[in-house]
Regions:
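Charge-rich, well-structured scaffold segments of protease-associated domains
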Residues: 83-92, 149-155, 174, 343, ...
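Active-site cores that bind ATP or allylic diphosphates and position pyrophosphate for catalysis
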Residues: 74, 80, 110-114, 126-127, ...
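Long, charged, mostly alpha-helical binding arms that flank functional sites
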Residues: 292-371, 375
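Core subunits and conserved enzymes of cellular information-processing
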Residues: 273-277, 281-283, 345-348, 352-355, ...
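Intrinsically disordered or highly flexible coil/loop and linker segments, enriched in small
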Residues: 29-30, 99, 159, 206, ...
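N-terminal Rossmann-like or analogous alpha/beta NTP/dinucleotide-binding catalytic cores
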Residues: 2-182, 245, 272-296, 301-306, ...
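Glycine- and acidic
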Residues: 34-41, 66-73, 260-268, 328-334, ...
Length: 592
């Protein structure tokens, strides 16, 4: 992994970047340090891409670093599977753009203890490139330090062990329009609290029997300050820490201290954590930590139309087998988008175009699709493919005649290259490119009509062949070979141009035509989102492809001319069986 800074590029402008720019100008921090801290309890989705791009973008633009840290404080819901998936997704999204800013856990795994003013401090700070390993940060690596900090809060009279059940705790909490009640255990002595907390750690009590709570203000209008829990008992094996612990810190307690330990300067999160900021600050200031404290900033999350980003609802889609798994190309998960063939650069472009604001709103999915089309138009190799083939016979070509035609690989390239495609007596065209009784302004093939076969020549429809049931089986045409490239009549114009493949020089492949999963822009607003599933979100066809696609690469993207953009499917493909996934159609078929 390169640690060389990339060339300076103009950064988008938004309120968070303006704040950071001000801090850089006044030299408030030696280095800008951000973090992306997912909980490993699910797969990342398109909404997370905004946070990834913002946090890594801030580091990239300011020669800083961004830590990938797993906030793994709830072992009940977390799993190594998600750690591996999230790590792969993040590295895919930032590859070639900001991977030099990605900081991994330093060698030695744990921060060294520093003592200042008799208070424990385990500050880790920014990571030097030479110290990088390939393992991400884990909040669970700080459990020893977090436990010591909790003891400090108890000694200062700012935390206590509470025996209320979870249900009683919620009842005592009150409501937004009425104050909470103090726990009857709130005024235990420091000595008793220390003893009970240490016994909690030793595993003497069952799940839910006791918790450690902060002592703040049960009458606060901010519900998050009504003596929130700091630790709870969970006799569960942890995916990373094993069986060492049976007490686990709550997110709001662990998160701010993990930021501090890693030297994070700007803790950027979504608007749902606005009310949590007061607790974030309370924990840090209550411990009298000697080094510069991180600060939390909030921005609006990304919610695209025609999709869902709720983990619970995405899980329903998986469990109900509406989709094939978390990486189904119809899902907004990053693994699903990647499998569908979405370029990481297109996703970054989309996130940049949406911007960073303080107001939640629904983002038109067409904006995302436009970014994908624009990106793929620049990089995709053009190829010929026919999804719904019907045979067309060029009667003036000999049965074994082969005419080599030059086809452009990518007209958008600064130095376009070509390949050879074979024109033979029998070819396939799309069934809907022919109409025996054409509607008005139909410029494709019809009886007596002419069209151009792209890269080849103009043909004229002379005769139709049907079977005993009246089904069309063959279209017989004449090829005007004088209209080929280099021919005397190459400039002759016709209104329609069709794609095609040679019947004798083509290959068969399965093609999966993916579309939007929902029929309405806001499926989350529906009473039952399963009732607005698009029944045509996946259509599978056996297509005829030009022979060169037998050597297709998973690293390439392809435009099947006049059809859309496609990527090679690798997960379910088998030797000798090609599968292509449609990434996106050439045009927005949903536009009104």
């Amino acid at each position: 992994m390169s640690t060389e800074p990339l060339p300076s590029v103009p950064a988008p402008s938004d309120f968070i970047r303006e704040i950071v720019a001000g801090h850089v100008a006044e030299k408030r921090y030696a280095k800008i340090v951000t973090r992306f801290p997912p909980e490993p309890n699910g797969y990342l989705h398109i909404g997370h891409a905004k946070s990834i791009c913002l946090n890594f973008g801030l580091a990239r633009e300011n020669n800083g670093q961004c830590n990938l840290r797993f906030d793994d404080t709830n072992p009940v819901k977390e799993d190594l599977e998600y750690v591996e998936s999230i790590t792969a997704d993040v590295q895919w999204l930032i590859a070639g753009w900001a991977e030099h800013c990605l900081a991994f856990k330093p060698k030695g795994a744990h921060p060294a203890r520093i003592t200042s003013n008799s208070q424990p401090d385990y500050y880790l700070g920014p990571v030097a490139p030479a110290a990088l390993t390939t393992e991400p940060f884990f909040a669970s690596d700080y459990f020893d330090q977090l436990y010591e900090y909790a003891l400090t809060l108890i000694r200062k009279g700012q935390a206590y062990v509470c025996d209320l059940t979870p249900e009683e705790t919620e009842k005592y909490r009150g409501a937004p329009d009425q104050p909470g009640q103090e726990s009857p255990f709130r005024h235990r002595s420091v000595a008793e609290n220390l003893d009970l907390f240490q016994r909690m750690k030793a595993g003497e009590f069952p799940n839910g029997a006791r918790s450690l709570r902060s002592k703040i203000d049960m009458t606060s209008p901010n519900m998050w300050l009504r003596d929130p829990l700091l630790y709870r008992i969970r006799h569960v094996t942890h995916h990373h820490a094993g069986d060492k612990w049976c007490i686990y810190p709550l997110y709001d307690y662990a998160h701010c201290l993990s930021d501090y330990l890693e030297g994070v300067t700007h803790s950027v999160c979504t608007l749902e954590f606005v009310d949590h900021r007061a607790l974030y600050d309370w924990v840090l200031t209550s411990l009298d930590l000697p080094r510069t404290l991180p600060h939390q900033y909030e921005f609006a999350k990304l919610t695209p139309g025609y999709t869902l980003v709720s983990k619970r609802k995405l899980l329903t889609l998986v469990n109900e087998k509406v989709v094939t798994g978390w990486d189904d190309p119809r899902l907004p998960t990053l693994s699903g988008l990647r499998r569908r063939g979405i370029p990481a650069s297109a996703l970054r472009r989309f996130v940049t175009s949406v911007g960073v604001t303080k107001f939640d709103s629904l983002t038109d999915i067409a904006v995302f699709e436009h970014a994908v089309r624009d990106e793929l138009n620049q990089v995709a190799l053009r190829r010929l493919a026919v999804l719904q083939p019907i045979k067309l016979v060029l009667t003036n070509l000999a049965p074994d005649e082969v005419i080599e035609c030059d086809a452009t690989n990518n007209p958008q390239s600064e130095t376009p290259t070509t390949r050879r495609v074979a024109l033979t007596r029998e070819v396939f065209i799309e069934a809907d490119d022919f109409a025996e009784v054409p509607p008005p302004k139909f410029f494709r093939l019809k009886p007596g009509g002419e069209v151009r076969l792209k890269y080849a020549c103009i043909i004229k429809c002379d005769e139709l062949v049907k079977d005993a049931t009246g089904r069309l089986t063959e279209i017989r045409c004449t090829a005007d070979l004088t209209t080929r490239a280099g021919g005397p009549n190459v400039a002759r114009k016709v209104k329609g141009t069709l794609h095609w493949v040679s019947a004798s020089a083509c290959i068969e492949a399965e093609v999966r035509l993916y579309d939007r999963l929902f029929t309405v822009p806001e499926p989350a607003a529906e009473e039952d989102f399963l009732k607005v599933i698009n029944p045509q979100s996946l259509t599978v066809v056996t297509a005829k492809l030009e022979a060169s696609l037998a050597e297709a690469s998973a690293n390439e993207r392809y435009q099947f001319e006049r059809l859309g953009y496609f990527a090679l499917e690798t997960k379910t493909a088998e030797p000798g069986r090609l599968i292509f996934n449609r990434t996106i159609s050439l045009k927005d078929t949903w536009a009104k």
